[in-house]
Regions:
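Transmembrane alpha-helices and adjacent helix-loop boundaries
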Residues: 2-333
Length: 333
């Protein structure tokens, strides 16, 4: 019986993951070559796709695994973007070299912001993150060193020709999206992932079993903030200009939340599927103006009512698949 179960269960599952791995490598190879056979407009769109995916994945980690519902997710976007622009312009250093520093600056901000934020919970925490994001927007709006209301251009990219600039930003976005997915998978398969899942299921039970709830949430907060900050920095390399109103816009949070809800909160596959659906809808119906936003809102409501687990849950109802090997099932006797 055990050998039959092994043949019918474990081996096919491993074979399936191997096939998924080969397909993913082929897709990544094709995407890496995109600058040589796609237009600048297509590359700019793909930069948006990869960076917004990373932001949505980070929000999904916070809400789906840490129970941290963030309404002010744009604060990480703004900190990462402004850190990159300020450091690159003021120091005159290649912005690609400064991306790790911008990520580190966002991680430091996340660590410091946890002090007041983690004193709040529930709705107060969600609103508190939005208030903090608004405070940052107002501070940059009145800071002449950061360009005040007019923002600042990314002057350090001016020395590169258009092809090199676009290709460099595109590859940075691709690495950001793939790297975010890799880090999320690595985290969820490790001890931190186990701790977060136990906290998500029951904080009382997790605490009783010896899990440090605050430490687990803090680690997740810093990791998700860093991913979002890096994505924000790369996203604004694509536009070559930052302004307080755009960078700290609530639209970033709205997009991340919509993608996570549509695809499936608490999964790695959900943000991937949600991002694809979001951009298909945007590119197809954005020209309809306010009706487009009404449609997005209605779709989100319908999804939450009829498919609370998102579009990915509709897939798993029909097929038992786990392409990233994150799902943890209870052992069967």
């Amino acid at each position: 019986m055990n050998s039959i179960a092994l043949m019918n269960g474990t081996r096919p599952r491993k074979a399936g993951r191997a096939v998924v791995g080969v397909v993913l490598l082929a897709v990544l190879g094709a995407l890496a070559l995109a600058p040589w056979f796609t237009s600048f407009a297509t590359q700019r769109l793909l930069v948006e796709v990869f960076t917004v995916f990373a932001m949505a994945l980070a929000w999904n980690l916070l809400a789906g695994y840490g129970g941290l519902v963030v309404v002010g997710h744009q604060m990480f976007v703004g900190v990462g973007a402004y850190a990159l622009f300020a450091l690159s312009n003021r120091l005159g250093i290649n912005p690609w070299i400064m991306l790790p520093l911008a990520t580190a600056a966002t991680a430091l901000f996340a660590l410091l912001s946890a002090l007041p934020m983690f004193r709040l919970s529930g709705a107060h925490f969600a609103v508190g993150t939005w208030v903090l994001a608004e405070m940052l927007r107002i501070l940059t709006l009145n800071n002449e060193w950061l360009g005040a209301g007019g923002g600042m251009p990314l002057e350090a990219l001016g020395s590169f020709d258009r092809w090199t600039r676009n290709a460099g930003v595109y590859w940075s976005a691709l690495i950001t999206g793939v790297g975010a997915l890799f880090i999320a998978r690595l985290m969820l398969r490790g001890k931190l992932g186990l701790a977060l899942m136990s906290v998500r299921d029951s904080e009382a039970a997790a605490a009783a079993s010896g899990v440090s709830i605050q430490r687990a949430k803090l680690a997740l907060w810093v990791i998700a903030g860093s991913i979002t900050g890096l994505a924000g920095a790369v996203a604004y390399m694509n536009t070559l200009q930052v302004t307080p109103d755009a960078t700290f816009s609530l639209n970033w949070s709205a997009a991340a939340i919509f993608i996570a809800v549509l695809g499936g909160i608490g999964t790695l596959e959900g943000p991937i599927l949600g991002t694809i659906l979001y951009f298909l809808l945007r590119e197809s119906f954005a020209s309809y103006g306010s009706w487009y936003f009404i449609g997005l809102g209605s779709l989100a409501i319908v999804t939450m009512v009829f498919a609370p687990g998102g579009a990915w849950s509709l897939v798993t109802r029909r097929w038992v698949i786990d392409p990233f090997g994150v799902r943890r099932d209870m052992p069967r006797r």
